[in-house]
């Protein structure tokens, strides 16, 4: 025992927490905590749920900033260059934090890319870890199909892969076979002997006997710490569990005294309080006497803080020995803008590749991403914008001349009407009331004679020269089309039979823009193509971060120093190939499947569609970053999409809006994109046209703004951290 203690005393401090306090709201989780851990040791944090174990780990990793106090990891504060978070740390969270769509090989390859491990070194390390942890060799099997114990071992493999100097394991042996657990502890001991500092949290108290030090936690404070055998001997116990029980009882007794001193309404006698106090004093005296032999010499350890601590261990993966031998040079290199940009780029590519593999392996998601936009545009062109056909219409034709019948025949040839002859107006109106007919044309007996008189004698009007129309006017679109066709057919008939032009307006050809015979679908198509790509881009990214936040995957990436910008750009890269395929197929269906005219540059059409889809992706990432569960993300996506659909001018001209509301559609990216698409496709204009270049400018501005918000929202947990660090360093 004495030799072990002497060895520990010769080691340098790896972690130091001084007077650290951290709470959530008004609740303090850890209060005035002091903790020192020496390098090359195995340390167990033991405590019930809510005792502060996870908060301590997150504080050490730099994910939480203490409300007060100081945290040093290898002599550096969290987020200092070359410290935590970063590849110096290996982290195995309790949740597992794995990507269940990936295989074991894909998982380890992804994290090797994150840590920039050389390929030859990665292969040897991978084989070593697979053998150690008895991991399955089935490369085609997803991690999600493994048992709970196997998943835990995969998570542990990820933490060990890059040979970190600091290893933080949250419940690493839960659900693992006893033999494998024993092998893991033996391996951890060999790592500690080589200089790796290991922190373990566990509920299995007796399992901590194999560690160098245990920290017994309760209600955010350390009840006791020291070597396991020493604590067992000191408290005259058989097991650590018994030691913990005695300490909890002592803590309860102390709490009683403290509460009674602060409470005038005593429910205990003075003698009871004196007895409890004397018991606590005796225990505390024993603790003070023994701590002189067991606790670290903090003053000496603090003097040992220097950069040499980084030189007496194995080199970090991906950093050359030359860099490691010159810590200042390494620090200067890592602090350079080009190096940081290069690191962000590498992480983005790694995350993008991982995301793409996840999509490819998930057949449901892949089918949705490939087929959904195509199905939507097909349904749109089939269901919207066409003219109604075979409308049930009644006719009461009492005209003794030929014009009434000629007019009905002209209407029948349009294909819009399916006429039924009735003998009486009352009978035909009843069919409208019963829903069997949309309307009725009632032609009186003198119609032909009267209409000719009206043409010949303009000074006298004969009311018999008109046809009475009865209709169900509740369907606005059908009413509009019917009235338009009734007028158009009569104009055509008058011109054919009497060479009379009823409409004094002449359309001059060639037109300035467009085709006078264009259909409503031609007006809708450009905007709908934009909106479908925009909406689908939102849907595929709006849940991207939610699951990763819940299962701890994001926390693991943050612990390894991956920036939020890398995560956001990585998701862009992962979805980009499929997004380009989707938009290509969507435009091909519109142009060649339904003959939507494109008078302008097809490249501009494609670029505008892709740009708006990028805005949709970035908006989806914002939604994902602020959502706690997937249902929230879905609801927010719908809440964003429908106002955009309604107010973008796709379904109805913006000129119809009230003046006080015009500002809202004009700030939406889909509004400008839809108008620009319509101008390019129907007018044939290019970037010189104001509406087109303004649209590109607005869409680009929205893209930059939303990416910034996505990074900020995803990084919200670190906001107070950076402000606090800034204040401290001022």
From Swiss-Prot:
Start-end of Low complexity biased regions: 282-298
Gene Ontology MF term list: ABC-type transporter activity; ATP binding; ATP hydrolysis activity; ATPase-coupled transmembrane transporter activity
Protein source organism: Dictyostelium discoideum (Social amoeba)
SMART domains found in the cross-reference section: AAA
Topological type in the membrane: Multi-pass membrane protein
Assigned GO CC terms: ATP-binding cassette (ABC) transporter complex; plasma membrane
Membrane-crossing segments per the record: 520-540, 572-592, 602-622, 634-654, 692-712
Primary localisation category: membrane
ABC transporter domain location: 15-244
Domain ABC transmembrane type-2 span(s) in chain numbering: 489-717
Residue ranges the record marks as coiled coil: none
Protein name, as recorded: ABC transporter G family member 20
Gene3D superfamilies: abc type-2 transporter like domain, P-loop containing nucleotide triphosphate hydrolases
Family label: Belongs to the ABC transporter superfamily.
Pfam families hit by this protein: ABC2_membrane_3, ABC_tran
Binding site for ATP: 47-54
Record region (Disordered): 281-303
Any one GO biological process: sorocarp development
Localization (cell): Membrane
Record's keyword terms, sorted: ATP-binding, Membrane, Nucleotide-binding, Transmembrane, Transmembrane helix, Transport
């Amino acid at each position: 025992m004495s030799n072990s203690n002497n060895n520990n005393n010769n080691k340098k401090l790896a972690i130091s927490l001084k007077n650290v306090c951290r709470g959530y709201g008004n609740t303090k989780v850890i209060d005035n905590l002091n903790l020192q851990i020496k390098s090359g040791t195995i340390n167990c944090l033991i405590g019930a749920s809510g005792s502060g174990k996870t908060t301590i780990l997150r504080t050490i990793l730099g994910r939480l900033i203490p409300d007060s106090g100081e945290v040093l990891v290898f002599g550096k504060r969290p987020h200092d260059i070359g410290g935590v978070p970063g590849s110096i740390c290996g982290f195995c969270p309790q949740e597992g934090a794995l990507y269940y769509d990936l295989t074991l090989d894909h998982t380890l390859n992804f994290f090797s890319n994150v840590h920039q491990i050389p390929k030859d070194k990665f292969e040897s390390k991978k084989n070593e870890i697979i053998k150690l942890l008895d991991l399955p060799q089935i490369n085609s099997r997803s991690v999600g199909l493994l048992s709970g114990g196997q998943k835990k071992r995969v998570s542990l493999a990820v933490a060990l892969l890059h040979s970190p100097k600091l290893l933080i394991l949250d419940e690493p042996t839960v659900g693992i076979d006893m033999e494998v657990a024993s092998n893991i502890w033996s391996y951890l001991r060999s790592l500690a002997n080589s200089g790796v500092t290991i922190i373990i949290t566990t509920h299995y108290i007796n399992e901590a006997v194999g560690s160098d030090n245990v920290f017994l936690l309760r209600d955010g404070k350390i009840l006791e710490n020291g070597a396991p055998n020493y604590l067992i001997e000191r408290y005259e116990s058989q097991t650590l569990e018994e030691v913990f029980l005695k300490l909890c009882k002592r803590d309860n007794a102390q709490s009683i005294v403290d509460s009674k001193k602060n409470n005038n309404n005593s429910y205990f006698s003075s003698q009871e309080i004196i007895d409890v106090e004397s018991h606590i004093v005796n225990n505390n005296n024993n603790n003070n006497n023994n701590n002189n032999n067991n606790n670290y010499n903090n003053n000496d350890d603090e003097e040992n803080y220097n950069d040499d601590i980084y030189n007496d261990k194995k080199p970090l993966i991906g950093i050359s020995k030359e860099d490691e031998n010159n810590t200042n040079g390494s620090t200067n290199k890592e602090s350079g803008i080009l190096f940081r940009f290069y690191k962000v780029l590498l992480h983005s590519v790694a995350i993008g590749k991982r995301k793409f593999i996840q999509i490819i392996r998930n057949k449901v998601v892949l089918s949705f991403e490939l087929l959904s936009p195509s199905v939507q545009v097909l349904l749109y062109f089939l269901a919207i914008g066409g003219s109604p056909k075979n409308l049930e219409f009644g006719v009461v034709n009492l005209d003794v001349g030929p014009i009434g019948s000629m007019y009905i025949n002209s209407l029948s040839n349009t294909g819009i009407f399916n006429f039924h002859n009735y003998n009486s107006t009352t009978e035909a109106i009843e069919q409208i009331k019963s829903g069997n007919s949309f309307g009725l044309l009632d032609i009186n007996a003198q119609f032909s004679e009267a209409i000719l008189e009206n043409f010949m004698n303009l000074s006298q009007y004969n009311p018999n020269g008109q046809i009475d129309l009865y209709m169900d006017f509740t369907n606005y679109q059908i009413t509009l089309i019917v009235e338009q066709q009734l007028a158009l057919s009569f104009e055509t008939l008058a011109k054919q039979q009497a060479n009379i032009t009823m409409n004094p307006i002449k359309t001059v050809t060639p037109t300035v823009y467009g085709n006078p015979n264009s259909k409503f679908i031609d007006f809708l198509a450009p905007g709908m193509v934009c909106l479908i790509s925009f909406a689908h881009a939102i849907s595929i990214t709006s849940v991207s971060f939610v699951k990763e936040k819940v299962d701890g995957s994001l926390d693991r990436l943050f612990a390894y120093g991956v920036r939020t910008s890398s995560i956001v750009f990585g998701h862009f890269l992962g979805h980009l190939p499929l997004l380009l395929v989707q938009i290509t197929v969507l435009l091909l269906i519109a142009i060649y499947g339904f003959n939507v005219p494109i008078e302008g540059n097809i490249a501009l059409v494609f670029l505008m569609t892709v740009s708006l889809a990028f805005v949709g992706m970035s908006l989806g990432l914002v939604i994902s970053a602020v959502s706690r569960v997937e249902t929230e993300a879905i609801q927010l996506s719908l809440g964003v999409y429908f106002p955009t659909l309604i107010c973008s001018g796709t379904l109805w001209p913006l000129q119809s809006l009230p003046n006080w509301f015009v500002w809202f559609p004009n700030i939406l990216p889909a509004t400008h994109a839809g108008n620009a698409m319509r101008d390019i496709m129907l007018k044939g204009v290019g970037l010189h046209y104001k509406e087109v270049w303004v649209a590109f400018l607005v869409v680009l501005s929205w893209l930059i703004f939303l990416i910034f918000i996505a990074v900020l929202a995803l990084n919200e947990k670190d906001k107070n951290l950076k402000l606090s660090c800034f204040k401290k360093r001022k």
